Amino acid sequence: MHTPIGVKPVAGSKEWREAWQKRAFAHISNGYKYIYIAIDSPEIFLLVCSLIRI
């Protein structure tokens, strides 16, 4: 499994949400629709992240 550089924030925390939002916007051109999926289902977003190696 791909491990992001740096300390992983606790899932569900404010820091965690900010972290995945930043990664989502950094890859907005590659997966714009995943941002909307992530808003409703963070678990799905994390799966997508692992698959596309954000």
Curated annotation (Swiss-Prot):
**The encoding gene:** yojO
Protein name, UniProt field: Protein YojO
Q: Which family does it belong to?
A: Belongs to the YojO family.
> What organism does the UniProt record list as the source?
Escherichia coli (strain K12)
Q: Which domain of life is it from?
A: Bacteria
